[in-house]
Swiss-Prot record:
<dbReference type="Pfam" id="PF00679">
    <property type="entry name" value="EFG_C"/>
</dbReference>
<dbReference type="GO" id="GO:0043022">
    <property type="term" value="F:ribosome binding"/>
</dbReference>
<dbReference type="InterPro" id="IPR000640">
    <property type="entry name" value="EFG_V-like"/>
</dbReference>
<dbReference type="InterPro" id="IPR005225">
    <property type="entry name" value="Small_GTP-bd"/>
</dbReference>
<dbReference type="InterPro" id="IPR009000">
    <property type="entry name" value="Transl_B-barrel_sf"/>
</dbReference>
<dbReference type="InterPro" id="IPR035647">
    <property type="entry name" value="EFG_III/V"/>
</dbReference>
<dbReference type="GO" id="GO:0005525">
    <property type="term" value="F:GTP binding"/>
</dbReference>
<dbReference type="GO" id="GO:0005886">
    <property type="term" value="C:plasma membrane"/>
</dbReference>
<dbReference type="GO" id="GO:0003924">
    <property type="term" value="F:GTPase activity"/>
</dbReference>
<comment type="function">
    <text>Required for accurate and efficient protein synthesis under certain stress conditions. May act as a fidelity factor of the translation reaction, by catalyzing a one-codon backward translocation of tRNAs on improperly translocated ribosomes. Back-translocation proceeds from a post-translocation (POST) complex to a pre-translocation (PRE) complex, thus giving elongation factor G a second chance to translocate the tRNAs correctly. Binds to ribosomes in a GTP-dependent manner.</text>
</comment>
<dbReference type="InterPro" id="IPR006297">
    <property type="entry name" value="EF-4"/>
</dbReference>
<feature type="binding site">
    <location>
        <begin position="140"/>
        <end position="143"/>
    </location>
    <ligand>
        <name>GTP</name>
    </ligand>
</feature>
<keyword id="KW-0547">Nucleotide-binding</keyword>
<dbReference type="InterPro" id="IPR004161">
    <property type="entry name" value="EFTu-like_2"/>
</dbReference>
<dbReference type="Pfam" id="PF14492">
    <property type="entry name" value="EFG_III"/>
</dbReference>
<dbReference type="Pfam" id="PF03144">
    <property type="entry name" value="GTP_EFTU_D2"/>
</dbReference>
<keyword id="KW-0378">Hydrolase</keyword>
């Protein structure tokens, strides 16, 4: 193709993504667009086509990114090249959304005609505005009995400040309004900027591991062009590779001779190691590099740490490989080896949040067939010892002896909670219950309020999101930055089963709530741990002091069943004999702890009601 032809082709490209709150119909709309543009034959069509992971279909959420090329013949007779980049909608995956938005010029904002604007919609719209995208509002599910498109239209204008007078009224399920959306993309989404003659600059927005071709990068070409045979350089680490193949997804991978400015596609270059490719990195040509990398990409810091252990310790190396492969597609997953007396060899992993943790756990179990145990999540504490030493501890079992601890600092976050006015009371009550300190409150408009609190990160990782969403009917949007470390009265609580410490059940708690939380966990474990042949005491202890105890009663055979009447001393003899047997069993017996016991330390629902 000549430079002139490439420039004309660039004018016809439209890169866009779909942003929406969970369940507002994003994946269904993507399916309809694929059908309307005849990208996928009706024989191959299936619901949530872009959500290729079983897990995504089951949970009805989008986790990974997918980028697809479609051809659309517009009413003006011209054929346009659309690149649809699918985005996740959950708060844990905000970074994935920001990556995919950086590869677009426009975004379709899908809002449910019955539910209206929700928290995550807002968060994603702000990300789109940060990337200077043209936003096309679409009011979806207009065929629902509870739909109120006019109210939602006003809401979009008042809350987000977008002109919604031309918002398309659609129903992705019934296929209403799809053509209008496609026409609006042609008219309103700008063609990609960028110079096809400039040095290559391409943004990596996702990567997938392929056993035969190595790491496959999903890229958006910002300037220049790339073709097989080129020598590319990754700008973050200076490593060079030879391009073996480039192409696009339709959703299947299709080879191409080149990818030019504005294109979204994949690139394979025999990249062997997972760690070389950083999502958000810039690809350029080794012999004619770009002057500066693309900006706006940050290293992700994990919020939540938890131990992951294979139930079968011989699977340790398989688990390491599995985590390395997951890390390739998920720049936000961190892990390092660790050992536990109770659980053996495993890994300490860092996650973005609790949904992220859940998803990784399920993917390890499903895709790699590894049965595993996961411990309760925690954050990184600074522990100052009486010798003047500072330790960084993210695992409660590594906490030093309480007598040697001088002080403990924990991370606080500056939490910005945007919420409709009627829920301000509920948000303030929740934040205070979670040991938050009020900072300030601003009114954004007549209805929305921005509340700022300083809250310990440890309180947020438990169930702050869920509590916030339920106490505000899902309207609160929440964003946080780690602000500082502060001294806190924290203690390490150990759980003892049958007199033995279970290191994987230890956790850190504020002194004020230690008694209640200890009591709650002991009661929970009593319900979860199966009864044994002998009595099992469960104790919660701080140092040497036992703060709560509960006993699991022994299973016992009725040894008196064959004594019909008869002498009481005969019965007593049988009972004494049974008692001696149980005592002997107790001294040598060990207690199996089921996976739910580790997770029960997680969900502190009841203890929130008590606080």
């Amino acid at each position: 193709m000549t430079i002139e032809q490439l420039k004309n082709r660039q004018e016809k490209i439209r890169n866009f993504s779909i942003i929406a709150h969970i369940d507002h119909g994003k994946s269904t709309l993507a399916d309809r667009i694929l059908e309307q543009t005849e990208t996928v034959s009706s024989r191959e069509m299936q619901a949530q086509l872009l959500d290729s992971m079983d897990l995504e279909r089951e949970r009805g959420i989008t986790i990974k990114l997918n980028a697809i090329e479609l051809n659309y013949k517009a009413k003006n007779g011209e054929t346009y090249i659309f690149h649809l980049i699918d985005t996740p909608g959950h708060v844990d995956f905000t970074y994935e959304v920001s990556r995919s938005l950086a590869a677009c010029e426009g975004a379709i904002l899908v809002v449910d005609a019955a539910q209206g604007i929700e928290a995550q919609t807002l968060a994603n719209v702000y990300l789109a505005l940060d990337n200077d995208l043209e936003i096309l509002p679409v009011i979806n599910k207009i065929d629902l009995p509870a739909a109120d498109p006019e109210r939602v239209r006003t809401e979009i204008e008042d809350v987000i400040g977008l002109d919604a007078s031309e918002a398309v009224l659609a129903s992705a399920k019934a296929g209403i309004g799809i053509e209008e959306i496609l026409e609006q993309i042609v008219e309103k989404v700008p063609a990609p900027k960028g110079d096809v003659e400039a040095p290559l600059k391409a943004l990596i927005f996702d990567s997938v591991y392929d056993a035969y071709r190595g790491v496959i990068l999903q890229i958006r070409v910002m300037d220049g062009m790339v073709k097989p045979g080129d020598k590319i350089e990754l700008m973050s680490n200076g490593k060079t590779f030879d391009v073996t193949e480039v192409g696009i997804f339709t959703p299947k991978a299709v080879n191409r001779d080149f990818l030019a400015t504005g294109d979204v596609g994949y690139l394979a270059a025999s990249i062997k190691t997972v760690a070389d490719t950083r999502v958000g990195d810039t690809v350029t040509l080794a012999d004619c590099p770009a002057e500066a990398p693309l900006h706006g990409y940050k290293q992700l810091n994990p919020m939540v740490f938890a131990g992951i252990y294979p139930i079968d310790s011989s699977k340790y190396n398989d688990m390491r490989e599995a985590l390395e492969k997951l890390q390739l597609n998920d720049a936000s997953l961190h892990f390092e080896p660790e050992t536990s007396q109770a659980l053996g060899f495993g890994f300490r992993c860092g996650f973005l949040g609790l949904l992220h943790m859940d998803v990784i756990q399920e993917r390890l179990e499903r895709e790699f067939n590894i049965d595993l145990i996961m411990t309760a999540p925690s954050v990184v504490y600074h522990v100052y010892t009486t010798d003047g030493e500072r330790l960084e501890v993210s695992n409660p079992s590594e906490f030093p002896d309480p007598t040697k601890v001088d002080s403990i600092e924990e991370p606080y976050v500056k939490a910005q909670i945007m919420v409709p006015q009627e829920y301000v009371g509920a948000v303030m009550e929740l934040s205070q219950r979670k040991r938050g300190d009020f900072v300030t409150m601003d009114y954004i408009d007549n209805n929305r309020v921005n509340v700022i609190y300083q809250i310990p990160l440890a309180e947020i990782v438990f169930d702050f999101f869920d509590k916030l969403k339920s106490s505000t009917r899902g309207y609160a949007s929440f964003d946080y930055d780690i602000s500082e470390y502060r001294k806190s009265k924290l203690v390490k609580m150990d759980i003892l089963l049958n007199g033995d410490k279970v290191d994987a059940l230890s956790f850190i708690v504020h002194k004020e709530f230690a008694y209640e939380r200890g009591k709650l966990i002991v009661e929970k474990l009593k319900k979860i741990i199966p009864r044994q042949q002998f009595e099992v005491p469960i104790q919660a202890a701080i140092g040497q002091k036992i703060v709560a105890r509960s006993d699991i009663k022994a299973l016992r055979k009725n040894v008196l069943a064959k004594c019909y009447g008869g002498d009481v001393s005969r019965k007593r003899k049988l009972l004494e004999k049974q008692k001696a047997g149980k005592k002997r069993m107790k001294s040598i017996g060990s207690v199996e702890v089921p996976q739910e016991a580790f997770l029960s330390v997680l969900s502190m629902d009841d203890d929130d009601k008590k606080k």
